[in-house]
């Protein structure tokens, strides 16, 4: 969190994002060529890309070069992007959706956007900020809020993913709230590609 604003300011963050995308595409291509299961992977894109006219075209050209179907990439944007030019953002999200790339809004509820933004955003997945779960452990009203927030988002047509799941109690809360997906240390910590391959094999047994 401390170095990202610096890279956004000097413009280096866009190079980092595309380097990560290239590594993801290389992994997917290798997995497909070796007959391994290929799963969709989320790639975070900084709000700085909103000012780049050919942002979507750069993504698609990389997919075409590696011959990766768009369905294997999820473009992940943080909710802070809604502070920028919504016209350009809406245009880019629409082009991504048209191409077959899914879109997720990361860290939702971290303090930038409001719920009414969701009514006009083309996204597939809303990722609830980990703060919601930390509040749920401290405040008796928080689980009720989380439950109805998830229910509202699902009724709007979004899939909901909860970030920062670390305990069985948190998982049970989300299961009872009918949350679609979870991520967090309860299942796994960040890992290198070889370890991820083994994890995927074991997880699918």
Q: Where in the sequence are the language-model features?
A:
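Conserved, function-defining core regions and hallmark residues within catalytic/recognition domains
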Residues: 3
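Residue-level signal for well-ordered alpha-helical positions
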Residues: 9-10, 139
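Catalytic core of bacterial c-di-GMP phosphodiesterases, primarily the EAL and HD-GYP domains
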Residues: 10-88, 164
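Catalytic-core regions built around general acid/base machinery
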Residues: 59-62, 91-99, 148
């Amino acid at each position: 969190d401390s170095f990202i604003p610096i890279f956004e300011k000097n413009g280096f963050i866009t190079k980092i994002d595309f380097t990560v995308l290239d590594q993801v595409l290389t992994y997917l291509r290798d997995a497909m060529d070796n007959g391994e299961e290929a799963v969709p992977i989320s790639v975070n894109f900084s709000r700085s890309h909103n000012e780049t006219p050919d942002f979507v075209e750069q993504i698609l050209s990389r997919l075409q070069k590696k011959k990766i179907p768009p369905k294997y990439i999820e473009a992940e944007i943080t909710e802070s992007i809604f502070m920028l030019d919504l016209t350009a953002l809406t245009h880019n999200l629409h082009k991504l959706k048209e191409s077959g790339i899914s879109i997720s809004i990361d860290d939702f509820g971290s303090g930038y956007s409001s719920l009414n933004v969701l009514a006009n955003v083309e996204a597939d997945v809303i990722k609830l900020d980990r703060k919601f779960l930390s509040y749920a452990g401290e405040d008796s009203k928080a689980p009720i809020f989380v439950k109805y927030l998830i229910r509202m988002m699902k009724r709007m047509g979004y899939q909901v993913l909860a970030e920062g799941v670390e305990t069985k109690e948190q998982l049970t809360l989300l299961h009872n709230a009918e949350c679609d997906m979870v991520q967090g240390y309860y299942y796994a910590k960040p890992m290198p590609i070889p370890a991820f391959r083994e994890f995927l094999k074991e997880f699918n047994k």
